[in-house]
Amino acid sequence: MGPLLQLAGTRLHIGIDDTDSIKGMCTTYLGFRLARLLQKEGAEFEDYPRLVRLNPNVPWKTRGNGAVGMTVNVSDPEAARKIAIDAVSLYSDLENGANPAAVFCEGGIPQPVRDLSREALHVMVEQERARGIIERHCSGLFYTGSGQGMVGAAAAIGYEFGDSTLELLSYRREENRGTPRPIWPEDVRGIQGAYPDTFNSYDEARGTSIIAPRGPDPVFYGIRGELASSLLGASEMVRTPERLEGYMIYRSNQGTADHLEYVIDAADPRPYSSGTISGVISTEPVVREGGHVFFEINAGGSMVPCAVYKESGMTDAAALLRGGDKVVVGGGIRRESGSHPKVLNVEFARVERLARIYRMANPYCTKCSKSMKSKGIGQGFKCTRCGAASIHRVEREIPRGISVGLYLPVASSQRHLARPYGRQGRTSRIQFDGASPWLGVFDSGE
């Protein structure tokens, strides 16, 4: 037992964000290092460290707009805060533009901080407003640079998990970062078969592994699921010759589609907001250069342009929509520019009702079940097989080629927060087992 922990300790919530840049680092890696440091000092973890994905449409995010938090019991909160601040100062990628922040709360989590977290899932939160909430309701704030990370850091503390998932993230030693990750797709392909509660490890539609990032950051791979035991077992299936530094399991809102619970105001959609819009298709879909599909929805009299991009794998279905179809779409609002209006970038579509479409056609022969032939203009129709005749063309319903139901991007194009098909209708109440190996160190290189 280290010097920070005793039976009657202080409950300390720590939130961290914006420690990375597009050139490297990852806030989850800083969380891994911080958790190790706190554990060594005897801090008691109440739950898995948390990885909270926030509004994916904010323009200044680096990759997945994820903030990290953790709740520990310590006898010396000031010493614990110093450990966290030192870690943020040491590991943040400051020279490449990171603007990190660490937020601290003691005891219970104030309701304004919870409200801020919920808001940060759907819209852009002004930094100064977040700072005011932090200074009034939290016990500490540290930041460098612009301090943009304070919004996510507070949100990581305030987020309330209803549904949740887990992610096991493994980390590379420093000398290997920036090199190709030696992972074999055939190993990854078997994970979801062996552990059905895992998800989005392999894209069957495109035949690709999707557990590893492509950039120079410290993450080697991440496996998502609902049971810690499954993640640990799945990690054993990923063979690699590379020596890794270690791993940590995070509780997360990934795979919950939590950011799409907000209903977007169709009359005045806020740029960069996330949510859903319900309405009726009002224009025929148009396929533009690149294979992207555009259409409009009439939502209570407001017309909302929508875009489905080729990379999503949903364009074939989107192109089959027709005027009068009732749909619910979810996604993010792209701001208007000189060349285009505000557009909802579609992340999912649920077709609730299909319009019935008819065309005039030659009548069928009821005896032969065959389409009759025209005898000439104004002369009616005749069956060439049995000779039966009919005078008028008939109205015939056209098969639509699309069904009522849910349409999602292929796995490799889904955002971190997207709820995959296998998690539709599910809510996971994951219990924390502090005695389980939720954090492991293989080789720190120290």
Swiss-Prot record:
Main location, first listed in the record: cytoplasm
Any single biological process term in GO: tRNA wobble cytosine modification
Subcellular location(s) per record: Cytoplasm
One Gene Ontology term, aspect cellular component: cytoplasm
Keyword Hydrolase: no
GO molecular function: ATP binding; ligase activity, forming carbon-nitrogen bonds
Reaction catalyzed: cytidine(34) in tRNA(Ile2) + agmatine + ATP + H2O = 2-agmatinylcytidine(34) in tRNA(Ile2) + AMP + 2 phosphate + 2 H(+)
Pfam families xrefs: TiaS_FLD (PF08489), TiaS_TCKD (PF22641), Zn_ribbon_TiaS (PF23783)
Keyword match Thylakoid: no
Keywords: ATP-binding, Cytoplasm, Ligase, Nucleotide-binding, tRNA processing
InterPro entries: TiaS-like_TCKD, TiaS_FLD, tRNA_Ile2__agm2C_synt, Zn_ribbon_TiaS
Entry's EC annotation: 6.3.4.22
Function as written in the Swiss-Prot or TrEMBL entry: ATP-dependent agmatine transferase that catalyzes the formation of 2-agmatinylcytidine (agm2C) at the wobble position (C34) of tRNA(Ile2), converting the codon specificity from AUG to AUA.
Family from the record: Belongs to the TiaS family.
Protein name: tRNA(Ile2) 2-agmatinylcytidine synthetase TiaS
Organism from which the protein derives: Cenarchaeum symbiosum (strain A)
Source taxonomy: Archaea, Nitrososphaerota, Candidatus Cenarchaeales, Candidatus Cenarchaeaceae, Candidatus Cenarchaeum
Gene transcribed to yield this protein: tiaS
